[in-house]
């Protein structure tokens, strides 16, 4: 454990916090084993406690601004769908940056708050090899296929899909 230089009370609090972090990490690992979750290493820390909890996963990544939730969403016809923070080119950070420039941060957050229901209720459309779209009347969610039957949300567009 790293040495913390502070008052005795601060040192005690720091040690307690480190123990809590270790317990949380062990809990996440246990969830991954029980649910057979295989997070993609390139996306960093997996918040396994939000498995199949799209709304919770979204909130967690908005707070942490890094990492992933493997299996944040699930559809019977697709299986698990991962939500990753990503960077400026893909993932949740890309979606927020793009929508914040288009509108403002508040409206961008409101827009992505509908991600869970749009994934559940949208129509599947194959866009190109390795990419699938989930479309609703107002939005298009782009999923990239990663590995064996893993889908990662890479974009969320506001489109008026009149053909649905």
How does the language model describe each region?
Residues 1-164:
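Ribonuclease/tRNase effector modules and their secretory precursors
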């Amino acid at each position: 454990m790293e040495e913390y230089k502070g008052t005795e009370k601060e040192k005690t609090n720091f040690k307690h916090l480190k123990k809590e972090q270790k317990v949380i990490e062990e809990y996440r690992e246990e969830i991954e084993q029980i649910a057979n979750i295989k997070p993609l290493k390139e996306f960093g820390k997996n918040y396994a406690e939000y498995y199949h909890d799209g709304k919770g996963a979204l909130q967690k990544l908005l707070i942490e601004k890094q990492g992933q939730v493997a299996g944040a969403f699930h559809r019977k016809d697709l299986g698990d769908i991962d939500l990753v923070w990503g960077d400026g080119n893909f993932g949740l950070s890309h979606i927020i940056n793009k929508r914040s420039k288009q509108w403002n941060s508040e409206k961008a957050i409101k827009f992505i708050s509908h991600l869970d229901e749009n994934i559940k209720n949208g129509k599947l459309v194959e866009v190109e090899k390795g990419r699938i779209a989930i479309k609703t009347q107002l939005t298009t969610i782009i999923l990239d296929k990663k590995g064996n039957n893993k889908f990662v949300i890479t974009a969320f567009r506001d489109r008026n899909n009149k053909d649905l």
